[in-house]
Amino acid sequence: MSLHHDNVTIAPLVLLSVLDHYERTNTPEGKRCVGVILGDSQTNTIRVTNSFALPFEEDEKNSDVWFLDHNYIESMNEMCKKINAKEKLIGWYHSGPKLRASDLKINELFKKYTQGNPLLLIVDVKQQDVGLPTDAYMAVEQVKDDGTSTEKTFLHLPCTVEAEEAEEIGVEHLLRDVRDQAAGGLSIRLTNQLKSLKGLQKKLNDIVIYLNKVINNELPVNHTILGKLQDVFNLLPNLGYNEETDVSATSNDMVTASNNLQRALTVKTNDELMVIYITNLVRAIIAFDDLIENKMQNKKLQEERNKELQADINKVESETAETEKVATD
C-alpha cells in the first residue's frame, strides 16, 4: 500500500549543495546537473535532509539518450548509510528550471533504489522571480475522463524550506551578511511587500494562461485544479455589484458597483485607522496617568523622608542640649 504524501520539506543544506554542484561543475547554459536526495518518506510529509551529486550526460537533440552512473549511485548510497542510517534514498534532483522529456524515464530508473515512489526535486539555480526556487513532483497514474488507458504523469507537491536549529543559525548569519545594512526597517518592509505583490501577479498570470489553454483544448480539464481555483474565488470578498440575477446590467451599474467597492474599502480602512488612533490615544492616557501617579508617589516619599530627616535633626538637637546641660551642672 503506497503512502499518500501531502507536502515536502527541504533543508537549506540541500539547496546550497545543489547550487554548489551547479557552480562547481560549470554547467553550460541550457544543460542541467543531476543528483540524489536523501531523507525520510515514511510519513505524509517528505523530509529532504541531504543530497549528493551524480555524473550525468544527456543528448540535447535526442531526449531519449542520456547516461547515469549506476555503480556510483550504489557506492555513494552505501557510504551514506554508514554515515547516517536514518537518511534513505528517496529520489533525485536536477537544476531544471522546468521538467524535461526524459524525466519520467529517469524517475523509473530510481524506483529500484527507493522504497516507494521516488521524489523529483527541481531546483532553479538562476531564479529571478519571487518565491521558493524549488518544485517537487511525484509520478502517478493519471486516469482519463474519456475511459482510455492511464498514463504516467507528474503530480506537483507543495514545498517548504525548514531547518534544524543549527541550520537556522547558519542561515540567519548568511542573511545578515547579504542584507543591505543601509536600508531601514520601512524600506525593507516596502521591498518585501512589492516582491509579494509581484509574486501574486505572476501566480495570477499563470492561472489565466492555464485557463486559456483549457478553453482552447490545449490542455485536458483537471477537475482537481478547477475545484481549488473555485475555492480561492469563494474566499474573495463580495463587495461589488450584488444583483447577480440581473443579466442586463448597464455600464452605470458597473460604475456604481465600482464606487460601492471603493466606498467599502475606504470605510474599512477608516475603521482600522480609527481603531489604531483610539488604541494610541488610550495608550497615551494610560502613560500620562502612570506619570501623574508616579509623581504623586515620589512627592509622598519625599515628604516622608523630610519628616524622618526633621525627626532625626530634632533628636540630635535634644541630645545635644541635654549633654550641654549635664556639662554645665
Curated annotation (Swiss-Prot):
Pfam families: JAB, MitMem_reg. Residues 8-143 form the MPN domain. The keyword Cytoplasm does not apply. GO terms for cellular component: mitotic spindle midzone; proteasome regulatory particle, lid subcomplex; proteasome storage granule. Residues 303-329 are annotated as: Disordered. The keyword Ribosomal protein does not apply. CDD domains: MPN_RPN7_8 (cd08062). Gene3D superfamilies: Cytidine Deaminase, domain 2. GO terms for biological process: proteasome-mediated ubiquitin-dependent protein catabolic process. InterPro entries: EIF3F/CSN6-like_C, JAMM/MPN+_dom, MPN, MPN_RPN7_8. One of its GO terms (molecular function) is metallopeptidase activity. Keywords: Proteasome. Belongs to the peptidase M67A family. This is 26S proteasome regulatory subunit RPN8. It comes from Candida glabrata (strain ATCC 2001 / BCRC 20586 / JCM 3761 / NBRC 0622 / NRRL Y-65 / CBS 138) (Yeast). The gene is RPN8.
